[in-house]
Amino acid sequence: EVETMAHYRGAKHFLPDVTTILDIGGQDMKCCRIKDGAVDDILLNEACSSGCGSFLDTFARSLGMDIGHFAKIALSAKHPVDLGSRCTVFMNSRVREAQKNGVSVADISAGLSYSVIKNALYKVIRLKKASDLGERVVVQGGTFYNDAVLRALELLLGREVIRPDVAGLMGAY
C-alpha cells in the first residue's frame, strides 16, 4: 500500500489529473487506475519477468551489449520483428529464429521493446486495444529509462505519455 501511494503521489506531481500509472521495473510490473483522485484498481505481474527490464538486459548481455546501446539501436530499426508477448522460453526461441533468418539486431531490439509493452497491455492489464489504457498516462520504473520501450508504448497508444526524469525512483516518492 505504501509503495502504491508513493507511485500515485509521484505521478500526480508530474500530471495532476493522471488516470493510469504503468510501472515496469526489473522484476515486476504494475498498473494503477486512478478514479476521482484515488487509486481505484491495481493490476500486478510478479510471476514472470518476460515483460520486465531484466528480460531486456539479459538479451542485451547475450549479444555482448550494454542495455543503453541495445535500446539506442532499437530506435533505428526499420522493421521491428514481431516476437509476440509470450514467456521468456518462447521468446528465446523466436529471437534465435529471427537471428537465423538474418534479422538485424536493431529490429530484434525494437521487437523486444514492443514485446515488453504488449505483455504489459494485453497479458497483465488485459486490454482489448492499446487505447483503452487511458488518456493521461504516467510511466514509471527503471525499464522506462529505455527510450525504445517508451517509444513502443507511445506508438501503440498513438500519443505521448509522461515519463518523469526520475521514473525509476517513483516508488519512493
What role is predicted for each listed range?
Residues E1-G25, K30-G37, D41, I125-K128:
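Conserved phosphate-binding catalytic cores of ATP/NTP-utilizing and phosphoryl-transfer enzymes
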Residues Y8, G26-C32, D41, C52, ...:
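Short glycine/serine/threonine-rich phosphate/pyrophosphate-binding segments
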Residues D36-H79, G168-G171:
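Glycine-rich phosphate-binding loop plus the immediately following alpha-helix
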Residues S115, K128-L156, A167-G168:
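Glycine-rich phosphate-binding loops at beta-strand->alpha-helix junctions
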